[in-house]
Design a protein with these regions (language model features):
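PRPP-associated nucleotide enzymes
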Residues: 1-175
């Protein structure tokens, strides 16, 4: 699975949507992978900004994550540089699996106001839902063994931090 190709599919979808729809959209990426995608989409679409949502304090496994959740929240805090109330928001994540992270992101988002609409866009959908959450746009439906996780990585191109490519790496799930 080619993460760059999947990114191009997301970009093409948003460009086609912008051509048909007069209402502006706001991008909000889930930290960390979704935020990378939102940042690049905003740049490629020439949008003035994008938001970042950190779900650390809204996760249902917060007690299990402990200090790791706090460090995550500190490393990339929620930042929404637009008015959430009444906005049409595209929530972006790298991988959709159980739906629990998206649920946590919606809780965090609604702490900032009530959007007019929220759509979900993901690079990869692994299935295996625990909650009734479905992405509005999926780069690709993928099958990955249960003992593995799909991790999005960002590779710098041309020595410029603003020029980077995406790739997926399979890693063994921690015991």
């Amino acid at each position: 699975m080619d993460a760059e190709l999947l990114y191009q599919k997301l970009l093409a979808h948003l460009r086609a949507r912008a051509a048909k729809q007069s209402e502006p959209i706001a991008l909000a990426g889930l930290a960390i992978g979704g935020a990378w995608i939102a940042e690049r989409l905003a740049r490629d679409l020439k949008l003035p900004h994008y938001g970042v949502i950190n779900v650390a304090f809204h996760r249902d496994d917060y007690a299990e994550k402990g200090l790791a959740a706090i460090r995550s929240a500190e490393s990339m805090a929620t930042h929404l540089p637009f008015e959430v109330a009444g906005a049409h928001i595209v929530l972006i994540d790298d991988v959709l699996l159980t739906g629990t992270t998206v649920r946590a992101a919606l809780n965090e988002l609604f702490d900032f106001g009530r959007p007019a609409s929220v759509e979900l866009m993901v690079l990869a959908d692994r299935g295996k839902r625990e909650l009734p959450i479905t992405a509005d746009f999926v780069g690709e439906h993928v099958t990955v063994a249960d003992h593995q996780i799909l991790v999005l990585e960002k590779t710098i191109r041309d020595g410029s931090d603003s020029q980077y490519a995406f790739q997926f790496v399979l890693e063994e799930r921690a015991a």
